[in-house]
Swiss-Prot record:
PANTHER family: A-KINASE ANCHOR PROTEIN 12 (PTHR23209:SF4)
Motif (AKAP CaM-binding 1): 594-614
Organism name: Rattus norvegicus (Rat)
Top-level lineage group: Eukaryota
Listed name of the protein: A-kinase anchor protein 12
Keyword Membrane applies: yes
Lineage: Eukaryota, Metazoa, Chordata, Craniata, Vertebrata
Length: 1687
């Protein structure tokens, strides 16, 4: 026990300087321990032998602890204390070791008192000397390093070792102490035997310790196992450490002990004695925190005031006895040790007391410390409190293990099996002689109780262990006010006494005392505070008393704790401190006033009855009572408990009257209940301290009135419920009154429900309540917190009542609003049960109905919102009470209080259960939405992710509700509720308009987090929504998809876009209807196929390679994001053209974003509509954009200025790269280019799709390649042509030249690849034509999503989701699909980004195609590559890098071929396309497509071969990619493990970045890393690509610089297309994020690896954003590269 105490005290020292105390103790005990070891070698040898055995036993006992302990034990037994010490050191064992040393020293002193006297003198002097150091260390405990320096000493080490020995003994004794609970007699016997042999006689002590060690080992097995594995490990570790201490009594053990002790302070929390102390402390605190309420109440009923007095007296007597015994023990061990022991006992008692009491003070700290060995917080607390005593404590801790044991016996009596177990060791024998003797008598039953509790607590915490002792402590201590250190010193004695008093207390004296105190507190406290009001409360009914009692217990365990605190004393005083305000008088009153109690009963009963006649009077009185209860909460607790018992009987005759009044009382109760709830809510913030007590009383008063009104049955209901709530805290106090009455609980609830029907005046009462409650809210603030706990308990009561109430209230729901008033009480309950079931049913029905409802839902939701607003108004009319009650409920039931009023108001306003259920469901959904949306779209997305499972429209509705919310959030909370309801309705009835407003897709973001799940949801949603959207409107689906795609930013953007998007959607709707029928028919075929095939491919690819798909899709998303980084232009251009041309928004962004979203939600139908819209709209949008550019003057000049929009796009990137000044031009260029590009894209897409439809992917790719090369060439030409772009065109010319070269190199092969892939893809391309567009949309939508990504990087995840789903779609067809999608995306992107990086687009196509050809992995890598392609494609030589990476990843040969093909393509197509693009993009694109078709057909035949090779390679690479790309990414990226698969994309992005950075070396290295097999071809390809990468590094920088300008462009575009501005601003942010967003996508892909990449890319982005020299950008890229390497 001394060890436990000293352990805790040491742990205080050790916590401050966990290492230092060890060293100090080692230094202090080195000679002393050695002396004790030498003098008490028999004892030490035995303990060493026993301790190792015990270690084995304890480790076995600790079972779990055996893991770490076995090593320690074995090593310790082996004498390997160094390792073991290192392992075990750092935990509290240092003090435990000190305690062990003391115990051993004490044992050795008792065994060889003479030797120990000599050695003990040395030890004492050394210990004392070291204790000052330990004190300084204790002071330095905060500074363990200093403490370590001070602790350095074999003596200290040996002390710790000795303490370890002691701890072993103590631990054994602790186990005995734990046994003290049940086996404490045995311990007492063994300890007594030890004491009889000599307080510290080592032989007898060792024998007792040996016996107790076995017992303790066994007991600890049960107790410590219960205590927990950590404690087991701690005790086991401590035991091995102890064994080591025994074995390593040598200086090595000391040195190692120092290390150990250094570790031990950390580990000491694990030390068995300190675990016990921790248990004592933590369980003490936890028990106080958790168990005091219930246990106190139980004990309060058990214990009477007399018992408390008796217990206190007994404790005092036992304290005196223990003091005497301690003195004897002190005298026996050594006079030297006696003085330090006295100090140590005092200090340790202070420490123990502090341990015990501090747990109250620092329950949290102790709980926290319990992990570390709560002694540490205690040490800290004790250190704070004991800073004065620490020196003494330290010296005493070292000097007097016996007294520490004694004190711990006292403390152990307190902690009883906590501290007692700790202190039982050696000091336990003397004290056990007295204490166990006393304890066995009194504590046998109490021990069993304690043991069971301790057993429970040991599993939970040490709170109960300490808790029981604190009760004993508190019982004497509280009267003595032992909160101070001085009192703690006195409490040390008390603690000693309390060892047995705990048992006595558990023998029921303390329990009786506790109950007596509670009763007294109830009586006295109630009498002083407001007998009249309590009389009212009590007069109302025993129910109120029961309820008050139960409610007080339910309302706040604090109140029982308050009562118990009086009983338990200062231990609870910290907790009681809050309640003590009311409790102080209560304690006095409780002590004073049984008579006041009777008077209170009498007074309360009549007065309560008097006021009862009038509901308003009741309410007034209730509020008065509330105010009275505010002051008399504690008295109310005890009073209501006793009152429930006495007054319950007295009032039972009165119950008929009350029941007669029940209608009134129910009304008042309802009003009171609502007012309670409101007042509690209102007062929750106001009432926390004393007000809490008052609050408890007011709660009791209110609930008393409730229950009184409700009748005795209501009382049992509330009482039972409270009892159930209390049941955990104290079933006895609440349970006993409620046991007899509880039967009628539901009846009372039903009655409560029935009077509600009767009480139509409730509205008046509620109105009165509203005003009264407003007043009471002021009064009830204190009641609030009590209510908070009460609410926590009461919700169940409400549920129970609601169950009965639901039966009638459900019927009543159709009743007037009065019922709704009751509903505030009921609805929170009724909806909960009906809520979920009805919600599910309604969700299912709505899920079915949602499809048709989607369009009308918005209008319906508007009507519903009006109705709901009306309902809310009705609820308000009902009184603020409905809202108030909702607010009151919301904490207990639904976090969204506003939603609840809507629920209730809806239920009230719409009595029909169906309506109520629907509204509840809606409200329920809304709460989620309301809560989630406010919480964050991510959380909302998470919520919606599950909701998406419910219905895709649920997401849309959520989005809609989100938009509605955004609109209505400004409205009153009722309006918010209405909005939530409307949102729920919107969810239920999806509305495309709102959906567009709610476009934010972050729900999918949350879903995207679970990509597979998202894909599943998306597949379901895609199929359902695609069908729905196809059937209903492709636009809503597109909107929904877009919302899903970029909900957060798009929500803002689409708010801006909404008009445009609406216009664009209208245009889409109109345009798709027109041209879409043409090209749209093809897209319909493709889109439908894609929409259909997408789910199929989604399903298959998901299963096939969800990760790869996710990674690939994410990489594709990254690629597209990077492309958007490149094409904040394309996406911005798309966005601009989209924003500028709302139709282009549907076109390019819808084509792109819609396709992605289509992939996400309704990518199928949406992509079809989007593709139709894109193509038709792109043509029309190109026109419209050309027209819209006139609308957007900035864009008009760009478009009009640059008839060759691809060049502008190139210029646009260049502009973005070069200057914000170019940004306006960029916006212009984007719009114009986007319009034309979209036009070209539209026609080209049409043509491509026509070619695709006719020629297949090859013609598409021919068109794509041609168009890309056209765009590239034209872009280059136009770059050079446009003055704005000229400077940019210089870079872009270089970039273009490089990229074109790359594409010419790569593109011809990749054209063939693409052709082949498209050839392979035609199968999927018709199916995935849209996924390709989906990839397109991700580009533009990634502009949004990236813009959104700037706002919320998770949007790219949604984009990823789109891409993932696209990839899911294309994963099976990943090679083809990805190639196709990438090609199409690149086509669209190239079209839109044409100016940006046609080559880059080509590069994107090439890497994407390569990747897709290579496989899903290469999609990952090409996506990785493509991700860099975003910025790096923007760099346009990055495609080289990208190409090298994928090529290197794929095959150097393939890469070289692809590079050659791409270059050829880019050369062929760029050259042919350059002029036509400059001349007429559409005609040129068409002509080029036609021209390209032959070439593409040739390429197709070649591609077919290449694709077969590439697909085979992709398949091979797919496997390789898992290995090789992992190796590649792994090798290339230092970010190996997590990055391997996921970071393959991000790493390859980084690799590409690095390739740009490292250029040739990185590319070559990457290639070599990618695949050694490919390294050959990769060498050349990577060299070319590396050279291009060098250029692309600069280009990439400029291109990445472009996103910052897109920000400017976005700002300028914000003038016209604010959505684009947002998309671009965020796209530029995401441009910077582009690498981030690739990483955002990537990190989600490669959560670990990508994160560094994100940083790198962020740095790269920012570096590129610097818009400095390519060299600078490259250097910056290299810096992020270094960062990547670092990361």
């Amino acid at each position: 026990m001394g060890a436990g105490s000293s352990t805790e005290q040491r742990s205080p020292e050790q916590p401050a300087g966990s290492d230092t105390p060890s060293e100090l103790v080692l230094s202090g005990h080195g000679p002393a321990a050695e002396a004790s070891g030498a003098a008490g070698d028999p004892a030490d040898a035995d303990p060493a032998t026993k301790l190792p055995q015990k270690n084995g036993q304890l480790s076995t006992v600790n079972g779990v602890a055996e893991q770490g302990d076995v090593h320690v034990q074995e090593e310790n037994q082996e004498g390997q204390e160094e390792e073991v010490v290192d392992e075990d050191v750092g935990q509290r064992e240092s003090e435990d070791v000190r305690e062990k040393d003391r115990v051993e020293e004490m044992a050795a002193n008792s065994t060889a008192v003479e030797d120990i006297t000599k050695d003990g003198q040395e030890e004492t002097s050394e210990i004392i000397e070291q204790i000052p150091a330990s004190e300084s260390n204790v002071e330095e405990m905060v500074q363990p390093a200093e403490s370590q320096a001070n602790d350095v000493g074999f003596k200290k080490v040996f002390k710790f070792v000795g303490f370890k020995f002691t701890v072993k003994k103590d631990k054994n004794e602790k186990s005995d102490t734990v046994q003290l609970l049940t086996v404490k007699k045995d311990e007492g016997e063994g300890a007594e035997a030890s004491v009889g042999a000599g307080d510290h006689q080592e032989p007898s002590v060792e024998t007792a310790v040996g016996e107790s060690a076995s017992k303790e080992s066994e007991l600890k097995q049960s107790t410590e196992k219960q205590e927990g594995t950590l404690k087991q490990e701690q005790s086991s570790t401590e035991i091995p450490l102890q064994a080591e201490s025994d074995q390593a009594a040598e200086e090595e053990a000391k040195d190692e002990g120092e290390e150990k002790q250094e570790k031990e302070p950390t580990k000491s929390p694990e030390s068995p004695s300190s675990p016990v102390s921790s248990e004592t402390t933590s369980s003490f605190k936890k028990f106080f925190t958790h168990g005091w309420a219930g246990w106190r109440k139980k004990t309060s009923f058990k214990k009477s005031k007399e018992d408390d007095l008796e217990t206190a007296e007994k404790r005092k007597e036992q304290e005196a006895e223990k003091v005497d015994e301690e003195e004897k023990e002190k005298t026996e061990p050594a006079s030297e040790e006696q003085e330090p022991a006295e100090d140590t006992d005092q200090a340790r008692l202070s420490a123990d007391y502090e341990k015990v009491e501090l747990p109250l003070e620092d329950q949290v700290g102790d709980l926290e410390a319990s992990s570390e060995e709560k002694c540490a917080p205690l040490a800290t607390e004790v250190f704070d409190e004991k800073m004065e005593a620490h020196q003494e404590v330290v010296a005493e801790v070292h000097v007097s293990t016996v007294e520490k044991t004694e004190e711990e016996q006292g403390g152990g009596g307190e902690a009883e099996g906590g501290v007692v177990v700790e202190g039982t060791g050696e000091s336990l024998p003397p004290e056990k002689l007295a204490e166990p003797q006393e304890v066995p008598q009194e504590a046998e039953p109490a021990e069993e109780l304690m043991k069971s509790r301790e057993m429970c607590v040991s599993g939970g915490d040490h709170t109960q262990l300490t808790d029981l002792s604190p009760e004993e402590k508190t019982l004497p201590k509280h009267p003595e006010g032992i909160v101070s250190e001085v009192e703690m010193l006195s409490s040390q004695e008390r603690i000693k006494v309390q060892g047995s008093p705990l048992k006595k207390l558990f023998s029921s004296s303390g329990l009786k005392k506790l109950s007596g105190k509670k009763q007294k507190g109830k009586r006295g406290g109630g009498g002083d505070e407001e007998p009249g009001e309590y009389q009212h409360i009590h007069t109302e009914s025993p129910e109120s008393a029961d309820e008050q009692k139960g409610e007080s217990s339910a309302s706040s365990p604090e109140e029982p704790e308050e009562t118990t605190c009086l009983e338990k004393g200062p231990l609870e005083a910290p907790q009681d401190g809050e309640a003590e305000e009311g409790t102080t008088s209560d304690g006095e009153k409780k002590r004073e006033g049984i008579t006041p109690w009777a008077s209170f009963k009498k007074m309360v009963t009549p007065k309560k009855r008097v006021r009862r006649p009038s509901e308003s009077d009741k309410e007034e009185e209730l509020e008065k009572v509330k105010s009275a209860t505010l002051s008399s909460t504690d008295s109310t607790v005890s009073e209501m408990q006793d009152e429930v018992k006495t007054v319950g009987e007295e009032q039972k005759p009165e119950e008929p009257k009350r029941r007669v009044d029940t209608s009134v009382s129910w009304e008042a109760l309802i009003c009171v209940g609502s007012s309670k709830k409101r007042a509690r809510k209102a007062s929750s913030s106001d009432d926390e301290g004393g007000p809490r007590t008052l609050g408890g009383d007011s709660h009791r008063a209110e609930e008393a009135s409730k229950d009184k009104e409700a009748g005795t049955d209501a009382v049992p209901a509330s009482t039972q419920e409270q009892d159930q709530a209390q049941g955990s805290s104290s079933p006895e106090p609440a349970g006993s009154p409620s046991e007899g009455e509880g039967v009628s609980t539901w009846e009372s609830f039903k009655r409560l429900v029935t009077p509600r029907k009767k009480s139509k005046s409730k509205l008046e009462e509620k109105a009165e309540d509203s005003s009264v409650e407003q007043l009471s809210t002021e009064i009830e603030p204190s009641r609030e917190e009590s209510w908070v706990s009460i609410k926590k308990f009461i919700p169940g009561r409400r549920k129970k009542r609601a169950d009965g109430k639901q039966e009638q209230a459900t019927v009543e729901d159709s009743g007037p609003v009065e019922i709704n008033e009751d509903d505030p009480d009921v609805p929170a309950v009724v909806p909960l049960s009906e809520y979920d079931a009805v919600e599910r049913e309604k969700m299912e029905a709505q899920g079915n109905a949602e499809l048709p409802q989607l369009l009308g839902a918005v209008y319906v939701s508007e009507e519903l919102s009006k109705t709901l607003v009306h309902t809310v108004s009705v609820a308000v009319i009902d009184g603020t009470r409905a809202v108030t009650s909702v607010e009151e409920r919301s904490p207990s039931w639904i976090s969204a209080s506003v939603t609840e009023p809507l629920e209730h108001t809806a239920g009230e306003a719409m009595p029909p259960v169906e309506e109520v259920t629907e509204k509840d469901i809606i409200a329920e959904e809304t709460p989620v939405l309301t809560q989630t949306l406010p919480e964050g779209k991510d959380a909302h997305d998470d919520m919606v992710t599950s909701e998406v499972d419910f219905t895709s429209e649920a997401v849309t509705a959520t989005e809609t509700s989100e938009a509605l919310r955004t609109e209505e959030v400004t409205e009153a909370s009722g309006a918010e509720e209405t909005t939530d309801m409307v949102s729920a309705v919107s969810q239920l009835t999806d509305s495309p308009d709102t959906t567009e407003e709610a476009t934010p897709v972050q729900e999918v973001e949350g879903g995207v987090l679970d990509t597979e799940e998202e894909e599943r949801q998306t597949q379901a949603i895609l199929q359902a929504v695609a069908d729905k959207v196809k059937e209903e409107s492709q636009v809503p689906a597109t909107q929904t998809v877009q919302r899903t795609g970029s909900k957060a930013l798009e929500k803002v953007e689409e708010v801006e876009e909404d008009s445009e998007v609406l216009a664009s959607e209208k245009e889409k709707d109109v345009m798709p209807k027109g041209p879409v029928q043409e090209a749209g028919a093809e897209h319909l075929a493709q889109g439908s196929e894609t929409g259909q095939a997408t789910p199929e491919s989604l399903e298959v690819p998901e299963v096939t390679a969800d990760v790869d798909h996710v990674a690939t899709c994410q990489v594709i998303k990254l690629q597209q994001l990077m492309e958007q980084a490149v094409a904040p232009e394309s996406s911005e251009t798309l966005t601009d053209s989209e924003t500028n041309g709302s139709t282009p928004l549907a076109d390019s962004d819808t084509a792109d974003g819609t396709q992605q979203d289509e992939t996400i939600d309704s990518q199928d139908s949406k992509a079809t509509a989007a593709v139709r819209q894109s193509q038709v709209t792109e043509e029309e949008a190109a026109t419209a954009q050309k027209e819209e550019p006139s609308t957007l003057p900035n864009n008009v000049p760009a478009q009009e200025e640059h008839g060759e929009e691809p060049g502008r796009d190139v210029l646009e990137p260049t502009q973005q790269e070069l200057a914000a000044a170019a940004v306006p031009v960029l916006a212009k260029t984007e719009v114009g280019q986007e319009g034309e590009v979209d036009w070209l894209d539209g026609e080209k897409v049409k043509e491509e799709q026509e070619v695709f439809v006719h020629s297949g992917p090859n013609s598409q790719k021919a068109a794509d390649v041609t168009y890309d090369s056209e765009v590239m060439g034209v872009a280059g030409c136009q770059e050079k042509e446009s003055t704005e772009v000229q400077s940019l065109s210089l870079e872009e010319g270089e970039m273009e030249t490089d990229v074109e070269k790359e594409k010419r190199e790569t593109k011809p092969e990749q054209v063939s690849e693409e052709g082949e892939q498209e050839t392979a893809a035609p199968e999927h391309e018709g199916t995935y034509g849209k996924p390709v567009l989906t990839l397109d949309m991700p580009s533009s939508e990634r502009g949004k999503a990236l813009g959104s990504l700037g706002g919320s990087p998770s949007l790219p995840d949604q984009d990823k989701a789109g891409c993932i789903e696209v990839q899911v779609q294309s994963l099976d067809t990943t090679v083809t699909q990805t190639a196709e999608a990438v090609e199409k995306v690149i086509e669209t992107v190239v079209i839109s980004e044409t100016g940006e990086s046609p080559e880059c687009v080509g590069a994107h196509l090439l890497p994407a195609e390569k990747s897709s050809a290579t496989g899903g992995h290469w999609t990952l890598q090409h996506a990785e590559d493509t991700v860099p392609l975003g910025p790096e494609s923007q760099a346009e030589s990055i495609p080289i890098i990208v190409t090298p990476a994928p090529e290197s990843t794929l095959h150097p040969d393939l890469q070289g071929e692809i590079s050659a093909s791409q270059r050829e393509r880019s050369e062929e197509e760029d050259k042919p396309d350059a002029g036509p693009d400059a001349d007429g993009k559409e005609s040129t694109a068409i002509e080029k497509v036609l021209k390209a078709e032959p070439e593409i057909l040739e390429l197709e035949s070649k591609s077919n071969k290449i694709v077969l090779n590439v697909i085979q390679t992709a398949v091979d690479q797919f496997a390789r990619t898992e290995t090789a790309p992992e190796t590649h990414a792994y090798d290339s990226q230092t970010q190996v493990p997590a990055m391997q698969a996921d970071s393959q994309g991000a790493q390859q992005m980084l690799d590409k970045n690095e390739s740009c950075q490292d250029e040739t070396p990185s590319a070559a290295a990457q290639r070599g890393l990618a695949s050694p097999d490919r390294s050959g071809g990769m060498g050349s390809a990577s060299e070319m690509l590396a050279a291009l990468a060098v250029e692309s590094a600069g280009v990439k920088v400029s291109i990445e610089k472009l996103p910052p300008q897109p920000k400017d462009q976005k700002e300028h575009a914000a003038d016209g297309p604010q959505l684009q501005s947002l998309a671009q601003a965020e796209a530029s942010a995401s441009g910077n994020l582009t690498k981030e967003s690739p990483d955002t996508n990537g990190p989600k892909l490669t959560e670990e690896g990508d994160a560094p990449k994100v940083e790198v890319q962020e740095e790269e982005m920012s570096t590129k954003s610097v818009k400095e020299n390519k060299a600078q950008a490259e250097e910056d890229l290299q810096e992020p590269k270094g960062d990547l390497a670092e990361s």
